[in-house]
From Swiss-Prot:
GO terms for cellular component: cytosol. This protein is involved in the repair of mismatches in DNA. It is possible that it carries out the mismatch recognition step. This protein has a weak ATPase activity. The lineage of its organism: Bacteria, Thermotogati, Thermotogota, Thermotogae, Thermotogales. It comes from Thermotoga sp. (strain RQ2). One of its GO terms (biological process) is mismatch repair. Gene3D superfamilies: 1.10.1420.10, DNA repair protein MutS, domain I, MutS, connector domain, P-loop containing nucleotide triphosphate hydrolases. It comes from the Bacteria. This is DNA mismatch repair protein MutS. One of its GO terms (molecular function) is ATP binding. HAMAP family: MutS.
Length: 793
């Protein structure tokens, strides 16, 4: 195949982006060649053609984002190569450059994103310590976490629902195994070596300004270098890194996030969906962050609660505030798109509309005394009003973006175009008079431009200044110096309008960039205002109460599960009292009775209080917990090659390693993944260790042997779920009371589940026979005892 200059250019650029699909702009299309073309054709279901024996597939430039989204979702990295000069102005080969590398974690376009964060994670490891830097390129948020605990790192990666992992080569295979559905890319070590990247990105004189460890600084440097590589720019929109530290926030492992159904996942209804009545995208993202990182500082928690209480107490102003917030747009992402030169005219309209709301919001804020006055750039509002159409059509350069009156020069060119048809009509009339040809017609087509058309019957009347341009079957087409001059002016006006709109739009965007810091601070303040007002709205809507904090007392009166109550009629409220003297609760009772719901609701009420929310209870006095741990349910870990029981023991090992006297531990059926004897022994030993540890524990179990703990340890109290029997019917009241379950009601639960009557009747026969045999052998007559006791009474 003969290599043309164009193909040489393509191959040279492709060499620099071997690991990406290269979309190469050719006129009105982005073309892919060779293997890239085959992939594009298959993924996008478009025709594969050939150009000089090279496989080729193309997509229209105006539909790029639609096709790009499909390629990225299919797991491909895509390099966009654009024409850097107008074809009409270049007689040589057009200069082309890659302007963007698109990966799942580097997307900023609105149509690609949901309201939630789109996190990329850069992961590094050095001498047994792990560092993860999370970045949402679309908002500029940067979070840093460092730990010597590999599982804690994996938990955070799972909790943040990351879209992309970037890591050192030696971590790539293990991370791919753990997160098979996440796009994972390895980078060379030199990404981690240039700490000057941090200084330049944040304009720092001293790199230690952030108080990050050497490993964290290296990982942050790698993130910065990678974002520069994908966005093809030195000017980044990155906020100062926020350290995820146990000193400030409760660290939640992924099991707890999943077991308590905190955020959307595989388990359907969740706490975030219940609480998320936010009015802004920024607020929704912040609420999710608060749920994943509850506070551990009592003063900070109480400040949030006080703000929520003030909002609850002024419902009229609260409603007004939320009405205004509902018109606030995603300022955070708009600023990011402007910074990366990816904004569209509607972004600037949305920004203006948001800024116009701020004075009205400030009036309402003065009623509360909770929030500071919102600062915003008034001069920018004025500029956006004058510059950008209220309803811009198309992109800059298409003549419908910049307002009339903003640029007198642009208005002149527009006037010329708008009156072109009128002037052509005048010219046509003048030529008809001059030539005496009444059927003379002035027209235009894209190939020949403007022309005068005369039928062949009238050719003897044409003046000397008519220059033949095209011959048709029944007529001839001509041009005159005057018409040629008019055409030149029109073409120049069209070109100049396109250039000027692009230039003016860019200049307005540059003005927006100058106000970046103020706009990002405004976005932060609006998000916080939205979350606090949402928590107040939730408190009113769901009848929540303000929690009070105590050093060691956990007292909940009329507690409810915030998620289950939303989807259940007549939810049964329950009480719990724990302190340092009585801090370990063993809960027995049959399946379906509500044991799991009860212990989860205690965890959720505690967590909600620590994000600054009112809670579903009549009264709540709570300690501030440093961690909430859960071990619930039976599940295996196929990706990690772990059985159900091994997963259970791994999670218990984490709890025994990390829990303190300030932790809340929620256990459901620990020890059920092995034999009964082994299970009871392990559960008893774990209970002893947790009692010594001093943490507050709620342990739901079918092992009635564990109720004997109360006789050995004064810290233990037994609870059960009240069950009523009416004839052959069993009623689960879901009410937690003092005491021990006297039977399991397993057959009754099977009956409720729809097991056929013949199977149920046979189960009763077997149960009766087994207990007769057991009574003869042991001399005991407790027909309903669930287990043979292992420990002496």
């Amino acid at each position: 195949m003969k290599v043309t200059p164009l193909m040489e250019q393509y191959l040279r650029i492709k060499e620099q982006y071997k690991d990406s699909i290269l979309l190469f702009r050719l006129g009105d299309f982005y073309e892919a060649f060779f293997e890239d073309a085959k992939i594009v054709s298959k993924v996008l279901n478009i025709v594969l053609t050939r150009r000089q024996d090279a496989p080729m597939a193309g997509i229209p430039y105006h539909a790029l984002n639609t096709y790009l989204k499909k390629l990225v979702e299919a797991g491909y990295k895509v390099a966009i190569c654009d024409q850097m000069e107008e074809p009409s102005k270049s007689k040589k080969l057009i200069r082309r450059e890659v302007t963007r590398v698109v990966t799942p974690g580097s997307i900023v376009e609105d149509e690609f994103l949901s309201e939630t964060n789109n996190y990329m994670a850069v992961v590094s490891e050095e001498k047994g310590r792990y560092c993860t830097v999370f970045c949402d390129v679309s908002t500029g948020e940067v979070l840093v976490h460092e730990s010597s605990d590999e599982q804690e790192t994996l938990d955070l990666l799972k909790n943040y629902s990351i879209s992309q992992i970037v890591c050192s080569e030696h971590l790539k295979s293990s991370l791919r195994e753990r997160f098979p559905g996440v796009y994972t890319e390895s980078i060379s070590e030199w990404y981690f070596s240039d700490l000057e990247e941090v200084e330049k990105a944040y304009n720092l004189k001293d790199i230690h300004h952030f108080e990050l460890s050497p490993l964290a600084l290296k990982t942050l440097a790698a993130l910065i270098k990678y974002v520069k590589y994908t966005m093809i720019t030195e000017d980044l929109n990155l906020k100062p890194p926020l350290l995820i530290s146990q000193r400030d926030y409760m660290i939640l492992d992924s099991a707890t996030v999943e077991n308590l159904s905190l955020i959307p996942g595989d388990r359907g209804k969740n706490l975030f969906d219940v609480l998320n009545n936010t009015e802004t995208p920024m607020g929704a993202r912040l609420l999710k962050k608060w749920i994943l990182h509850p506070l551990v500082d009592r003063k900070q928690i109480e400040e949030r609660l006080e703000a929520v209480e003030r909002l609850v107490n002024d419902r009229v102003s609260l409603e007004e505030m939320r009405n205004f917030l509902s018109n606030v747009r995603d300022v955070e992402r708009i600023v990011s798109r402007v910074e990366y030169n990816r904004s569209v005219p509607r972004d600037l309209v949305a920004l203006r509309e948001t800024l116009e709301i701020i004075p009205k919001l400030n009036e309402i804020l003065s009623n509360f005394g909770v929030f500071n006055k919102l600062a915003f750039p008034e001069e920018l509002v004025d500029l956006l009003r004058r510059a950008i159409e209220d309803d811009p059509l198309g992109s800059p350069g298409e003549g419908k973006v910049i307002k009339r009156g903003f640029s007198p020069e642009l208005d002149e060119y527009r006037d010329l175009l708008e009156h072109a048809e009128e002037r052509l009509k005048e010219f046509e009339e003048k030529e008809r008079e001059r030539t005496g040809i009444q059927k003379l017609r002035v027209g235009y087509n894209q190939v020949f431009g403007y022309y005068i058309e005369v039928t062949k019957a009238n050719l003897d009347k044409i003046p000397d200044d008519y220059e033949r341009k095209q011959t048709l079957v029944n007529s001839e087409r001509f041009i005159t110096p005057e018409l040629k001059e008019f055409e030149t002016k029109i073409m120049a006006a069209k070109e100049r309008i396109e250039e000027m709109e692009k230039e003016l739009f860019k200049s307005v965007c540059e003005e927006v960039k100058k106000h970046k810091e103020v706009l990002l601070k405004l976005s932060e303040d609006l998000a916080k205002m939205d979350v606090l007002s949402t928590l107040a709205y939730d408190a009113i809507l769901y009848n929540y109460t303000k929690p009070v904090f105590s050093e060691d007392r956990l007292e909940i009166k009329g507690g409810r599960h915030p998620v289950v109550e939303r989807f259940t009629q007549n939810f049964v409220e329950n009480d719990i009292y724990m302190d340092n003297e009585k801090r370990f609760v063993v809960i027995t009772g049959p399946n379906m009775s509500g044991k799991s719901t009860f212990i989860r609701q205690v965890g959720l009420i505690s967590l909600m209080a620590q994000i600054g929310s009112f809670v579903p209870a009549q009264k709540a006095i709570l300690p501030v917990f440093d961690r909430i741990f859960t071990r619930m349910g039976a599940r295996d870990d196929l990706a990690g090659g772990r059985s159900t029981f091994l997963v259970e023991m791994n999670e218990m090992a984490l709890i025994l390693l990390k829990s303190t006297e300030k932790s809340l531990v929620l256990l459901d059926e620990v020890g059920r993944g092995t034999s009964t004897q082994d299970g009871v022994s392990i559960a008893w030993a774990i209970s002893e260790e947790l009692i010594k540890r001093g943490c507050k524990v709620l342990f739901a179990t079918h092992f009635t042997e564990l109720t004997e703990l109360e006789k050995h340890f004064p810290q233990v109290q037994n609870k059960t779920i009240l069950v009523k029997e009416e004839g052959k019917n069993v009623i689960f009241t879901h009410k937690v009371v003092d005491g021990v379950a006297d039977r399991s009601y397993g057959i009754e639960v099977a009956k409720i589940a729809g097991i056929p009557d013949r199977v149920i009747n046979r189960a009763y026969e077997i149960l009766e026979r087994n207990f007769k045999n057991h009574t003869k052998k042991n001399g005991k007559s407790n027909r309903f005892s669930q287990q043979i006791p292992l420990f002496p009474v």
